Amino acid sequence: MAIIKKFRIKNFKRKKEILKLDKISVYFGKRKIFEDLSFNLNQGEILGLLGPNGVGKSTIFNIIIGLLKPNYGSVFIDNKNVTDNPIFYRTKEHKISYVPQHGGYFHDLTLRENLKAISEMVIEDKKLRDEKI
């Protein structure tokens, strides 16, 4: 089981909930990854997931960004249920990004090239894309 650690940034006064996973269950075939997992994240908090390989850390992040849909449960971002929304909606509307630990989406590209390729899918204006990267 993954251990969820939250740290609060000092002097950050807002406490708006920005992320909530509510009773998330994930199964790969008959294998239970986790069941009824719930947690929230407020503005000013940093989330860390700890645990050995295979306990569901990457699965949790894939659910948050929309690459994977849970078998049961809901994902809320800014109090909006986004469980059925694709990754492109979440990244564009909620400014969520994800950099995988093993070299990015396209293994032959640099980090900058990966960011550029992904940004082309969600930011139409080329000048704005170049500024952001």
Write out the residue ranges for each language-model feature:
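Conserved structural motif at the start of ABC-family nucleotide-binding domains
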Residues: 19-21, 34-36
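The feature captures the beta-strand-to-loop junction immediately N-terminal to the Walker
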Residues: 50-52
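Conserved Walker
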Residues: 58-59
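Helix-to-loop junction immediately C-terminal to a conserved catalytic motif
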Residues: 65
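ATP-binding/catalytic-site motifs of ATP-hydrolyzing domains
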Residues: 74-76, 80
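ABC ATPase NBD coupling module
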Residues: 81-97, 102
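Q-loop/switch helix immediately C-terminal to the Walker
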Residues: 102, 108-121
